[in-house]
Amino acid sequence: MQDGPKEYLLGRYAEQEFSKRETWFANNIFYPFCKDQLKTAKVAYKEELYYFCISVLWRILLSTKDYIADPKLKAKCIIALEEWRAFLNGGDVPPLYNQIYMMPINRELYNTLLLPIPEHIYKEIYWYILRDTDNEIYCEKPNNRALFCKIPRFFFWAVIERDDTALNYGLRISPDGGKIDFKRYNIGKGGIKTFIYQRVINRMNEEEKARKKITSTQRDLIEQRTLHDEHLLNSELGLLLRQCGKL
């Protein structure tokens, strides 16, 4: 039995190219970084990393563009979508929205003495960094905005507006390729760290609001179902959940 015709967001060519770049990213950066194999490494890359980052960000912006309230910002995002689509289908490097960044992140890279953070919030931050997915348009100041997509241990950024060139979005990825020196890499002292902290606090507040809406009977059923899942309890995820007070 054969499946019906498959729909492609960008067309068959671009989806096939994305699949190849995704495999390269997974094998050369994602898995080695998660295994702490890149702390002192230098990783050479060609155009595949730039293509992969834009492809990921294009998908995020396509799904979120209708929720952008600011008409001027939305207009810029529509242009970015068009430029990225053309590039992903074999066109030139985007002429306007071409500042693409990758930000690997883990506990060691996030740890900071700038904020007096309670231990239970640090655990939530680590959960966010190591496990969570997220996306949004980050607005540091009125004229500093960037789209981001977060997967476990990585942020991808595309600059939409930028006045402050000191903002640290991580590693600038070149469309011509280059080399990443992980030994010298850091995510700066403030800015993004403060953003992550506030993002986690906002999520905790939303979760607390949702938790209050659940009846005690519903909560008991959820807890009983979770406690009987031995596989979850004995897993790395289960350990992290217990540390966060969610099991």
Predicted feature residues:
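An N-terminal structural lobe/cap that precedes and organizes the functional/catalytic core
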Residues: 1-21, 34
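C-terminal, charged low-complexity interaction regions
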Residues: 74-247
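Short cysteine/histidine-rich zinc-coordinating motifs and their immediately flanking basic loops
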Residues: 21-29
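Short microdomains enriched in Cys/His and/or Lys/Arg
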Residues: 31-48
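Generic alpha-helical propensity signal that fires on short helical segments
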Residues: 29, 34-36, 67, 71, ...
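Structured loops at beta-to-helix junctions and adjacent beta-edge loops in soluble globular domains
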Residues: 8, 12-14, 52-60, 150-152, ...
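Short flanking/linker segments adjacent to small metal-binding domains or redox-active Cys/His motifs
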Residues: 17-20, 50-89
